[in-house]
Amino acid sequence: NFSLKFIEQSSQIKSFNRNGDSPKVYIADNSEIFIDEIVKEIKLCQEKGFQSICLICKTEKNSTYLFNKIKHKLDIQLIKNGSVSDLQGVFILPVYMSKGLEFDTVLICDADSQNYHDEDDKNLLYVACTRALHKLSLFCENEVSPLI
């Protein structure tokens, strides 16, 4: 199970298998390709019939930045505070707001070495990865996190 690499082996967490493809990691050489790859993946997931698609970023600042880059390319909702009542559609939110939620598809959109590099970040990656019910993709610009 992909997400188990982010927790201590001695933990008493029981995992269960999710249906779907193995997670994919996308590495882009520049920000234009990075945004294009994310938009392409969202559209592909919509074509496959996934009803809830969530883009998860480490921070609210990263979420807002990404939202501003892609809001003109597709219908997406930025969640900054409060709760999400209807999990249908495309959302972007920081990882701390994703705990307890599940989505058909999750795209972790800042999975680079700058954002995820220490033990605390390992726990955040675990939370983000386990939000996906069927499909998980990780995106980074330039250098992938050493935790992945």
Regions found by a protein language model. Name each.
Residues 1, 11-20, 32-36, 43-142, ...:
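Core RecA-like ATPase module of SF1/SF2 helicases and allied nucleic-acid translocases
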Residues 27-29:
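Conserved AAA+ ATPase "SRH/arginine-finger" region at the nucleotide-binding site
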Residues 8:
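Nucleic acid-machinery interaction/catalytic patches
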